[in-house]
Amino acid sequence: MGALKLVFVTGNANKLREVKKILSTDVSSEDSLKIEVDSKALDLPEVQGSTQDVAREKSRAAAKLIGGPCITEDTALCFKAMGGLPGPYIKWFLEKLGLDGLNKMLQGFSSTEATALCTFAYCEPGKEPILFEGATEGNIVPARGPTNFGWDPIFEVSGTGMTYAEMPAEQKNSLSHRSKALDKLRQHFSRR
């Protein structure tokens, strides 16, 4: 099977590196679809809503701007004790509160459970986006590991005893919310 080339609309170098790594190493057989990713950074409007709403609108706008098919991503970190917040607003919560502040949000609650959610959207100009979602369960903990990739140091994956930041890249990429969403994307294009 040949290679599919996709444009990933992101300005986040860490996300791009991780997506390329996941898609280049997660090929289970010679017949599996290989996906090559290029990136383009665009200033897209950030709509408010669910990760699905955000991913749909970002991908529509991006496909129109670049004049071709593309993928976009929206990520959420949903605290069970807070009914799913900060959810898709995690980027702004992290910028304003920092890792320690996110932990403090859960003080007084009995649960530190959280879901990491990733929604990729594939869109061609003038067409409806196709969504691919992945989720990983875990808990919010005091920061452990390198602090150079968003909220990775405070999200401890259930059953591992480690935060995303503490894991070797191969381990994180085998069980992360992002890898689960990308696996669904790969399956979709493998069936085409």
UniProtKB/Swiss-Prot annotation:
<keyword id="KW-0479">Metal-binding</keyword>
<protein>
    <recommendedName>
        <fullName>Inosine triphosphate pyrophosphatase</fullName>
        <ecNumber>3.6.1.66</ecNumber>
    </recommendedName>
</protein>
<feature type="binding site">
    <location>
        <position position="91"/>
    </location>
    <ligand>
        <name>ITP</name>
    </ligand>
</feature>
<keyword id="KW-0460">Magnesium</keyword>
<comment type="similarity">
    <text>Belongs to the HAM1 NTPase family.</text>
</comment>
<feature type="binding site">
    <location>
        <begin position="177"/>
        <end position="178"/>
    </location>
    <ligand>
        <name>ITP</name>
    </ligand>
</feature>
<keyword id="KW-0539">Nucleus</keyword>
<dbReference type="InterPro" id="IPR029001">
    <property type="entry name" value="ITPase-like_fam"/>
</dbReference>
<comment type="function">
    <text>Pyrophosphatase that hydrolyzes non-canonical purine nucleotides such as inosine triphosphate (ITP), deoxyinosine triphosphate (dITP) or xanthosine 5'-triphosphate (XTP) to their respective monophosphate derivatives. The enzyme does not distinguish between the deoxy- and ribose forms. Probably excludes non-canonical purines from RNA and DNA precursor pools, thus preventing their incorporation into RNA and DNA and avoiding chromosomal lesions.</text>
</comment>
<dbReference type="GO" id="GO:0005634">
    <property type="term" value="C:nucleus"/>
</dbReference>
<keyword id="KW-0546">Nucleotide metabolism</keyword>
<feature type="binding site">
    <location>
        <position position="46"/>
    </location>
    <ligand>
        <name>Mg(2+)</name>
    </ligand>
</feature>
<dbReference type="GO" id="GO:0000166">
    <property type="term" value="F:nucleotide binding"/>
</dbReference>
<dbReference type="GO" id="GO:0036222">
    <property type="term" value="F:XTP diphosphatase activity"/>
</dbReference>
<dbReference type="GO" id="GO:0009117">
    <property type="term" value="P:nucleotide metabolic process"/>
</dbReference>
<comment type="subunit">
    <text>Homodimer.</text>
</comment>
<dbReference type="GO" id="GO:0046872">
    <property type="term" value="F:metal ion binding"/>
</dbReference>
<keyword id="KW-0378">Hydrolase</keyword>
<keyword id="KW-0963">Cytoplasm</keyword>
<dbReference type="GO" id="GO:0035870">
    <property type="term" value="F:dITP diphosphatase activity"/>
</dbReference>
<feature type="binding site">
    <location>
        <begin position="10"/>
        <end position="15"/>
    </location>
    <ligand>
        <name>ITP</name>
    </ligand>
</feature>
<feature type="binding site">
    <location>
        <begin position="74"/>
        <end position="75"/>
    </location>
    <ligand>
        <name>ITP</name>
    </ligand>
</feature>
<dbReference type="InterPro" id="IPR002637">
    <property type="entry name" value="RdgB/HAM1"/>
</dbReference>
<dbReference type="GO" id="GO:0005737">
    <property type="term" value="C:cytoplasm"/>
</dbReference>
<keyword id="KW-0547">Nucleotide-binding</keyword>
<feature type="binding site">
    <location>
        <position position="172"/>
    </location>
    <ligand>
        <name>ITP</name>
    </ligand>
</feature>
<dbReference type="GO" id="GO:0036220">
    <property type="term" value="F:ITP diphosphatase activity"/>
</dbReference>
<dbReference type="GO" id="GO:0047429">
    <property type="term" value="F:nucleoside triphosphate diphosphatase activity"/>
</dbReference>
<keyword id="KW-0464">Manganese</keyword>
<dbReference type="GO" id="GO:0009143">
    <property type="term" value="P:nucleoside triphosphate catabolic process"/>
</dbReference>
<dbReference type="GO" id="GO:0009204">
    <property type="term" value="P:deoxyribonucleoside triphosphate catabolic process"/>
</dbReference>
<dbReference type="Pfam" id="PF01725">
    <property type="entry name" value="Ham1p_like"/>
</dbReference>
<feature type="binding site">
    <location>
        <position position="58"/>
    </location>
    <ligand>
        <name>ITP</name>
    </ligand>
</feature>
<dbReference type="InterPro" id="IPR027502">
    <property type="entry name" value="ITPase"/>
</dbReference>
<feature type="binding site">
    <location>
        <begin position="149"/>
        <end position="152"/>
    </location>
    <ligand>
        <name>ITP</name>
    </ligand>
</feature>
